[in-house]
């Protein structure tokens, strides 16, 4: 099925019966591709539009990947991205451009433990339905810059530990964030170099 999926994607003729139907099918395909491609993995334009749950997708199979290009994935129906790249410890560069995240509700722990991640552009993500960003970037020790100023955080309820141990993240733009519905902001900037702190459940920039 996998070869059919990719060929039909490239031709723009993907039929419903040829797409991935479950998270398990996607993981099996990814594991096969990672085995073939090694440390530098390119899997573009994958149609996962029939799947709502991508949680822990690379957990246990992405440890040795250094560069990962997942641009153009069709993610319009995905609701759960919890721990998606959990402990991809060798990962330095990740390309997720073109993702439709408008229906995602949970991004908790999404990049948890990506200790060597240096390059990540998620500035254009639609986060209007996200409720949890808890520990989303926990332990991303080598990230130096992130522009998240365009994010809609009006429905987020938890940012606990979101930037925990992002010790090099000095260039972080959170301007315009709405934290009015957040219930838990504990440890949001713990051991983080970004010029922000939490005061009365609000994110305040340190001058």
Regions found by a protein language model. Name each.
Residues 1-207:
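Negatively charged
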